[in-house]
Amino acid sequence: MARVKRGVTAHARHKKVLKQAKGYYGARSRIYRVACQAVIKAGQYAYRDRRQRKRQFRQLWITRINAAVRQSQMSYSSFMYGLKKASINIDRKILSDIAIFDGFSFNILIKKAKEALL
């Protein structure tokens, strides 16, 4: 059986990892062994943070809605409960956009939520 030399395959693998590590600081972008670890860790962070991003945006939307609702002497939880009772199904992302860019419409939503609570 002929001897299999792996130089071409190994070089291709090293090149692939170093390409992924491009832009990293110091040895992480130049030395294969270190770059390999850095790329794996970066992948772990990316996987984790794709899930955290969803939580963080929801948290941001809730904070924005709460800030806008408190100007009308109402709490976030009672506002959301009032909207639910009034059968107004708008998600938090859209509510926060309305609160920021269209205060007039948001005030109407607050009034409807207050009426539904009475």
From Swiss-Prot:
It comes from the Bacteria. This is Large ribosomal subunit protein bL20. Signal peptide: none annotated. The keyword RNA-binding applies. One of its GO terms (biological process) is translation. It comes from Buchnera aphidicola subsp. Schizaphis graminum (strain Sg). Keywords: Ribonucleoprotein, Ribosomal protein, RNA-binding, rRNA-binding. Binds directly to 23S ribosomal RNA and is necessary for the in vitro assembly process of the 50S ribosomal subunit. It is not involved in the protein synthesizing functions of that subunit. GO terms for cellular component: ribonucleoprotein complex; ribosome.
